[in-house]
Amino acid sequence: MRAEKRWHILLSMILLLITSSQCMDSKEVKESERKTLLNLILQVIGEKPASRRVTSGLYSVSQDAKFSSRENTAHLPKPDNSRPIEIVPRDTSMKDKFIEHFTAGPVKFPSECRTHFHRIYHNTRDCSRPTYYKRCARLLTRLAMSPLCTQS
């Protein structure tokens, strides 16, 4: 039963490849659109491992992944419609402004909680990326109301 399914799948793929190449031979198709289904499939397969993105720090940088000996190492050019990476300088006090807005004022910590505050404020993802500033404000208010910080 499995062999029959494999033959059906194989025959349908071959049929699709043949019909797509014959369809593209018509006179109505422009030269720029003249790609067979096989070329499109190879392009998609070739782009997936090569277009992995690695995020380091604040900016994302595209880097080619290391390929094993079994993977295809074909490097295809990127399409022209890919957007360039924009580097926007950030205001250093922007984080403080957002957190003051979300916490409805400045958050004050006693000396016992300063180390916890600095760990959260400077070393977590929530307080280092602008998209997570609301989470950071929530974490800091929970820390300010925790029993450890309210004991003094």
UniProtKB/Swiss-Prot annotation:
Domain of life: Eukaryota
Signal peptide limits: 1-23
Cell location: Secreted; Cell membrane
S-S bonds: 113-149, 127-136
UniProt keywords, alphabetically: Cell membrane, Cytokine, Disulfide bond, Membrane, Secreted, Signal
Tissue specificity statement from the Swiss-Prot or TrEMBL entry: Expressed at low level in the notochord and iridophore stripes, the eye and the swim bladder.
GO MF term set: cytokine activity; receptor signaling protein tyrosine kinase activator activity; receptor tyrosine kinase binding
One of the protein's GO biological processes: positive regulation of ERK1 and ERK2 cascade
Effect of gene knockout: Fishes show reduced iridophores in eyes and operculum, with no detectable phenotype in the trunk. Fishes lacking both alkal1 and alkal2b show a complete loss of eye iridophores. Fishes lacking alkal1, alkal2a and alkal2b are embryonic lethal and display total loss of iridophores.
GO cellular-component term (any): extracellular space
Family: Belongs to the ALKAL family.
Task of the protein: Cytokine that acts as a physiological ligand for receptor tyrosine kinases LTK and ALK. Required for iridophore development in the adult eye by acting as a receptor for LTK.
PANTHER family: ALK AND LTK LIGAND 1, ALK AND LTK LIGAND 2-RELATED
Stated name of the protein: ALK and LTK ligand 1
Organism: Danio rerio (Zebrafish)
